[in-house]
């Protein structure tokens, strides 16, 4: 049995110029995930379920667990002295870590994706993304360090808190999965070099918003529902409402996750930096594809910290089909 710590160190030795800083950073995220796992499992007993009295920069009411997870991850990262600053879905601005100007990495994160589901015991997750800063080491980080395209990511991953807690990550050399053993307090390797199945048969989208979708997406949904034995259609519809949980299922079983623009969210709803980029990096490393319907997600130049985007991610052939329908059936 190989632990996450052992696996990370083993991979570090494959790079002659590795300094160990990224290893320490991933270990800090691992610690934060353990703390969140522990408290999610007793959330109903310690009054951290439900909404708080605060709103985030998008005007959304923050869940108590959102704020809790944000603070725990922030503390775990700051304590290691190897991160210059963070950007979080739960923070209005970047958070600069004083005394860490020498650090060369920054972290972007969604501390608890799908947190509105926690009250009903549905899987939730943590998403993280790591970049090398672009401003000089030795100076405080600025917003410029965080507004980098996804193709500049050094590492990305997510933790899914479900029937078991799993951590999945990539450093650009494949996607690897680890399952948390609470009796030992360690994440153990359960799958190395994960890949999307060759064919996907599941589509994940909130069809309750169908009337608000672009024409191309409506046509694609109908395509998924049509019978065609040559393409194994109709596809199965599965939607949890937690990006991490939906993506994880599709990664294992094959499928596509769709969150298009709507009349109320013309730019899309998911955050480019905290959700789309890390999941796109993972998808491509697992042989999949991620797009906003027209453009590769990882090539998009971000303009603001909380920028939103349409998001289609999963099996390559399924994302290709969505892009084709969007091209062929543009909105009037």
Swiss-Prot record:
MF terms (GO), sorted A to Z: fructose 1,6-bisphosphate 1-phosphatase activity; magnesium ion binding
Record note on cofactor: Binds 2 magnesium ions per subunit.
GO biological process: fructose 1,6-bisphosphate metabolic process; fructose 6-phosphate metabolic process; fructose metabolic process; gluconeogenesis; sucrose biosynthetic process
Cofactor or coenzyme needed: Mg(2+)
Functional pathway: Carbohydrate biosynthesis; gluconeogenesis
Pfam families: FBPase, FBPase_C
Superkingdom: Bacteria
Subcellular location: Cytoplasm
UniProt KW keywords: Carbohydrate metabolism, Cytoplasm, Hydrolase, Magnesium, Metal-binding
Family, similarity comment: Belongs to the FBPase class 1 family.
Subunit structure, interactors included: Homotetramer.
Protein's name according to its UniProt entry: Fructose-1,6-bisphosphatase class 1
Organism: Salmonella typhi
């Amino acid at each position: 049995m190989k632990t996450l710590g052992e696996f990370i160190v083993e991979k570090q030795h494959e790079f002659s110029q590795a300094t160990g800083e990224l290893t320490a950073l991933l270990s800090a995220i691992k610690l934060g995930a353990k703390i969140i796992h522990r408290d999610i499992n007793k959330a109903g007993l310690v009054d951290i379920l439900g909404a708080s009295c605060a709103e985030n920069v998008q005007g959304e009411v923050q869940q108590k667990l959102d704020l809790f997870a944000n603070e725990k991850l922030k503390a775990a990262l700051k304590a290691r002295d190897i991160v210059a600053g963070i950007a979080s879905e739960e923070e209005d601005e970047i958070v600069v870590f004083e005394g860490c100007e020498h650090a060369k990495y920054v972290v972007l994160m969604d501390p608890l994706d799908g947190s509105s589901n926690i009250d009903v015991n549905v899987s939730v997750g943590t998403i993280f993304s790591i970049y090398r800063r672009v401003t000089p080491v030795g100076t405080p980080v600025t917003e410029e360090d965080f507004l980098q395209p996804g193709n500049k990511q050094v590492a990305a991953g997510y933790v899914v808190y479900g029937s078991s807690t799993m951590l999945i990550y990539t450093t650009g050399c494949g996607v690897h999965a680890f399952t948390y053993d609470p009796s030992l307090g360690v994440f153990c390797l359960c799958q190395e070099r994960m890949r999307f199945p060759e064919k996907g048969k599941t589509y994940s989208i909130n069809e309750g918003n169908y009337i608000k979708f672009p024409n191309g997406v409506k046509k694609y949904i109908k395509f998924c529902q049509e019978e065609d034995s040559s393409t194994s259609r109709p596809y199965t519809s599965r939607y949890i409402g937690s990006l991490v949980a939906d993506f994880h299922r599709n990664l294992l079983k094959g499928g596509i996750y769709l969150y298009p623009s709507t009349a109320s969210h013309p730019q899309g709803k998911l955050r480019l930096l905290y959700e789309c980029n890390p999941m796109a990096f993972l998808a491509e490393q697992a042989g999949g594809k991620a797009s906003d319907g027209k453009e590769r997600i990882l090539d998009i130049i971000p303009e603001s910290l909380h920028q939103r985007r349409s998001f289609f991610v999963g099996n390559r052939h399924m994302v290709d089909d969505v892009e084709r329908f969007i091209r062929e059936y543009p909105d009037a």
